[in-house]
Amino acid sequence: MAKEFGRPQRVSQELQKEIAIILQREIKDPRLGMMVTVSGVDVSRDLAYAKVFVTFLNDKDEAAIKGGLRALGDASGYIRTLLGKAMRLRIVPELTFFYDNSLVEGMRMSNLVTNVVRNDEERRGPAEENPEEGKAE
């Protein structure tokens, strides 16, 4: 039976924290003019590869997102070097960066639900909002 919270999960959490610190403090690439957030890291079972999921602040522009991912890909070797100094791992995973649009999609879905609820309340009218108030005991 596999461990519920094994080594790959622990390494992935630590990598997420360390990569976020490195991106904030060490990477000075002008292509990363926007703030980068590490939303998750998936590490292979042998700890040789890691998929790093990132989001960008002000990520409305598709070209800026692609440029940011390209900059992160170009800096991945340097990031691995810094990770090797910060973490005690025999093998520092090879990093591949991916854009994580789940936050954007979550916000979009939340706005849709809010709009539907608002439209539903407008259709019902003020008299039907609280049916309990009209009842006398």
Curated annotation (Swiss-Prot):
It comes from the Bacteria. Coiled coil: none annotated. The keyword Cytoplasm applies. It holds the Pfam family RBFA. It is found in: Cytoplasm. GO terms for biological process: maturation of SSU-rRNA. GO terms for cellular component: cytosol. InterPro entries: KH_dom-like_a/b, RbfA, RbfA_dom_sf, Ribosome-bd_factorA_CS. One of its GO terms (molecular function) is ribosomal small subunit binding. Keywords: Cytoplasm, Ribosome biogenesis. Monomer. Binds 30S ribosomal subunits, but not 50S ribosomal subunits or 70S ribosomes. Belongs to the RbfA family. One of several proteins that assist in the late maturation steps of the functional core of the 30S ribosomal subunit. Associates with free 30S ribosomal subunits (but not with 30S subunits that are part of 70S ribosomes or polysomes). Required for efficient processing of 16S rRNA. May interact with the 5'-terminal helix region of 16S rRNA. This is Ribosome-binding factor A. It comes from Erwinia tasmaniensis (strain DSM 17950 / CFBP 7177 / CIP 109463 / NCPPB 4357 / Et1/99).
